[in-house]
Amino acid sequence: MITYQYTQKDWTTFKEGIKREWAVTNGIGGYAGSSMIGAHSRTHQGYLIASLHAPIERYLVFSKINETVTVGTRTVSFETSQHRASGKTVYAEGQKFLTSFIYDGSVHYAYETDNFSFEKHITLKRNANVCAVAYELTAGDSDCTFTLTPLFNYREHSESSTPDTLKFETFTEDRAFYLVPEKNKDIAIRFQTSEGTFSERETVYDIDMQLQIEVDLETDGLDCHYCPVDLSIAVPANTTKKVSILCSI
């Protein structure tokens, strides 16, 4: 497998950064994909598009994870996305903290800000509807709180969602958060972590994510995701911590 490596000179702007894309497959019809900077630009992108009956019935169940870090009173967001709001296109430009992107059959992102850095590795389990996301978190001279906001969905991979179509029964058990779609109560989406604390969010929908390539194809390119919980992880000063995430059906 050839290794492709890129650095900040390759995404001087948001629009440049979404021109290069990656994809990973699981061997049974499921896949993952996004852009080099982590912003989705196509309806068919996400961290886990599962094949409900291999190799067909492909559904987006796990779109992505947005990350923030809080150091003292300062919070930095690493979210990289494009949305439509109040008739305008708005950008979350977390790629400004992205220092490297590597594709070697799986995906590696590295981010850095004052007093904190982290690496993020995304891959799929072969012959299973399982996405693994591994983090390595490094704090500088101050204690940090690293917060993950997972974005979930349940839609056919070429469609789009609205808040009205994203309804779930949810519950937490041990270190896992479960979502059962109202549209299909025969499956459960499981989001499992090696550590951290789940907390409920006041805003539970990510509304009108705008997918630029779909816009270029003369559609509205809008999608919605369900994000009912945050996962918070404490990182003490001058330490490195590894955290593992599994999302599966």
Where are these regions (language model features)?
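Terminal accessory carbohydrate-recognition/targeting modules of carbohydrate-active enzymes
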Residues: 1-249
